[in-house]
Amino acid sequence: MTSRRQFLKTASVVTAGALVTPSALASGKASPLAAAAPASGKRIGLQTYSLGVELLKDLPNGLKRLAAAGYNEFELFGYNEQAAGFGAGGRDGAVTIKAADYKKACDDAGIKILSSHLSPSIREYKSENFAQFDEFWKKAADLHASIGIKYMVQPSLPSIKNDEDAKVVCEVFNRAGEICNNVGIKWGYHNHSNEFVRVPKAGEETPASNDPMARMRARGEYIEQLFLDNTDPDKVFFELDVYWAVMGQQDPCEWLRNNPKRFRLLHIKDRWIIGDSGMMNFPNIFKAGYDIGIDGWFVEVENGSKKGYTQFDAVCESAKYLSKASFV
């Protein structure tokens, strides 16, 4: 991977930042992850939230279609503690598949389960609840380890009004990371846009502290930065959702460059089908990710609409775009 990364460092930058016009999307260089891909093609990951129950209701055939489209790595969604498996997370029905059965189906289709999104249902992050968080993550880590998953990622933001709230949350994150490390799993946090609002120091809150738009302009520190500053790099990594960073008025490339050892995974996301809007500078984003040696990335396609397209079509079209892109 190192030689490919050195090659990428000499590649030309298409445009500065993460926003781009459609004409810029054709440029880029081959990736180091592509060099490590299976013989069938590039490493292309999918966050299964993109399909929800549409995938689970006919898993074998759905996996075949995704593999044919080019996907060969998964980040799961919908961990179900009671059922010891994975479902649709309450979306579109109650279909749950046992973890071992899910892994076998993916193995049969040639898809590796690399990561998983999950969050505890405990709402209050305070020291009195630490044991409850520990119990959740211990049970989840054991199940995930049993099917060879290497990354567990929390994608939900607790309530944070000041820097002290953030520090308590970070203590929970550090404890979760230590629990996961003990079974050979890396624990991480996934952003949306609210991590890029600012919170004041404890005791300096104002009425504007409860207004997300005002907090984006306010003094104080970004929640994402507080998480980076107050978590142990040996226990907690970060997965950057590049689309939600842009929606939070941030340049994802800048966050990657400024924190090269903390961001290990990416979510590649657009308004709907990847590459369709022309607003995301994917060549720059991939280059920034490869330059810091990311471990992987996953397409996420949320529900949208385009005449004649199903959600499954959108997911497959996204893979088609990335399979042909020279910068991946």
Locate predicted features:
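Acidic (Asp/Glu)-rich catalytic clusters
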Residues: A36-A39, L63-A68, D92-S115, K138-G148, ...
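Gly/Pro-rich active-site loop or hairpin
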Residues: G52-L55, L63, G93, A202, ...
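C-terminal segment of N-terminal export signals and the immediately downstream linker at the start
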Residues: S23-K57, N61, R65
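N-terminal secretory signal peptides and thylakoid transit peptides that target proteins
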Residues: M1-T15
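Active-site beta-loop-alpha junctions enriched in small/polar residues
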Residues: Y49-L51, F77-Y79, L118-S121, L157-S159, ...
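Glycine-rich, proline-tolerant flexible connector loops at the mouths of alpha/beta enzymes
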Residues: L76-D101
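Hydrophobic faces of well-ordered beta-strands that scaffold small-molecule active sites
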Residues: K42-Q47, F74-L76, I113-L118, M152-Q154, ...
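Active-site acidic/histidine proton-transfer and metal-coordination neighborhood
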Residues: A11-P22, A105-A109, I122-F237, F312
